[in-house]
Amino acid sequence: DHHHSTDEPSESSKPCCDECACTKSIPPQCRCTDVRLNSCHSACSSCVCTFSIPAQCVCVDMKDFCYAPCKSSHDD
């Protein structure tokens, strides 16, 4: 169980995504296009960030699903 807890996201430890784009293939190929500051969500394995300050980061992982929206996680 190799969990890298060095850059733990401050928002929440659960991965989430508001802007998710999927192809119409079977299985679908989904990519989260959310831009986050300084880090990607906790389950992201390929995080690409700009060199600006603060860095704007996008997760480029391809999944066959979308994560739950981040906005709804504040209501429970």
UniProtKB/Swiss-Prot annotation:
Alphabetical list of Gene3D superfamilies matching this protein: Cysteine Protease (Bromelain) Inhibitor, subunit H (2.10.69.10)
Does the record bear Cytoplasm in its keywords? no
Q: Which UniProt keywords apply?
A: Disulfide bond, Protease inhibitor, Serine protease inhibitor
Pfam families according to UniProt? Bowman-Birk_leg
Disulphide bonds in the chain: 16-70, 17-32, 20-66, 22-30, 40-47, 44-59, 49-57
The protein's matches in InterPro entries, at most eight in alphabetical order, are given as: Bowman-Birk_prot_inh, Prot_inh_BBI
- What is this protein's record name? Bowman-Birk type proteinase inhibitor DE-3
Site note Reactive bond for chymotrypsin applies to 51-52
Q: Which family does it belong to?
A: Belongs to the Bowman-Birk serine protease inhibitor family.
The GO terms describing molecular function are: serine-type endopeptidase inhibitor activity
Record's SUPFAM superfamilies? Bowman-Birk inhibitor, BBI
Quote the cellular component terms of the Gene Ontology held in the record: extracellular region
For the site Reactive bond for trypsin, which positions are given? 24-25
- Highest classification ranks of the organism: Eukaryota, Viridiplantae, Streptophyta, Embryophyta, Tracheophyta
